[in-house]
Amino acid sequence: MKNTFSRLFGFGDKESEFELQDESHEEIAKKVYEEIQEIPIVNITPNRYQPRTVFDDARIEELALTIRTHGLIQPIVVRQYEDDKYEIIAGERRFRAATKLGWEKVPAIIKNLNDTETASVALIENLQREELTAIEEAVAYQKLIELHNLTQEALAQRLGKGQSTVANKLRLLKLPEEIKSALLEKSITERHARALIPLKNEELQLKVLQEIVEKQLNVKQTEERIAKLLEEVKPKRKAKQKAVSRDARIAMNTIRQSLQMVANSGLNVNSAEEEFDEYYQITIKIPKKK
């Protein structure tokens, strides 16, 4: 059975091109672990394709304590991009923990990968850990789509996820930066953010975001608030006006002018006009006595 990494390392549209077809797990493992070195930490840089933008300092501290006690059991994975310069492919949390411990060198597996492969490994390695925020996950999906020229459906198949899951994550990227930041900082949940999408209007979205944070609205309260706002901004349907023929307008104006002439003669005439779907009705009351 081929692993997720092998299915995603490739180019073009055909699924076969995303797979390492003729290599066993043992051969792949041999390639991965063929070179381990102690590399100076100052010569290592974070992965430019790292989808994770928020690192929990408390958890890094916990990891550092574990490494101090048991050592670094799993080396980080890097690639060399210049003489004595290395970029992390996988294991940035371990790298940060080792740095926190004051290590001068860290054991690393050196792999020969190009930019596309490096990005794919970094993105998938983080996606598999399921520790990313919803926005970080959405960014990872978008980068994989761009790197491999995939459709949402194709990406979902390769990750073993439903297409709706991928689509819902990607919709979050259309939200204003303030809302995406709130998601990253975990001030709101993914369901809060998804509820804001139908508003469309950025000003309204930010207004509701402020209400969610300040009033600690739960998801149901947020959805009810948004439903009310959508009802308020819904354009009112104008009553359909039927076209009035030229002859009808002439007739109405003639009657009005005649009534005005009678009134000018000193006779107190009362009239009332009513408009129906198919006709106008004019009621005229003329007193018998002046």
From Swiss-Prot:
Swiss-Prot/TrEMBL GO biological process terms: chromosome segregation; division septum assembly; positive regulation of sporulation resulting in formation of a cellular spore
Portion annotated as DNA-binding: 153-172
Record's subcellular location: Cytoplasm, Nucleoid
Gene Ontology MF terms: DNA binding
Pfam families: HTH_ParB, ParBc
SUPFAM superfamilies: ParB/Sulfiredoxin
Recorded GO CC terms: chromosome; cytoplasm; nucleoid
Keyword annotations: Cell cycle, Cell division, Cytoplasm, DNA-binding, Septation
InterPro entries for the chain: Chromosome_partition/occlusion, HTH_ParB/Spo0J, Nucleoid_occlusion_protein, ParB/RepB/Spo0J, ParB/Sulfiredoxin_dom, ParB/Sulfiredoxin_sf
Main location: cytoplasm
Keyword Kinase: no
Biological function: Effects nucleoid occlusion by binding relatively nonspecifically to DNA and preventing the assembly of the division machinery in the vicinity of the nucleoid, especially under conditions that disturb the cell cycle. It helps to coordinate cell division and chromosome segregation by preventing the formation of the Z ring through the nucleoid, which would cause chromosome breakage.
Sequence similarity: Belongs to the ParB family.
Record protein name field: Nucleoid occlusion protein
Organism from which the protein derives: Bacillus mycoides (strain KBAB4) (Bacillus weihenstephanensis)
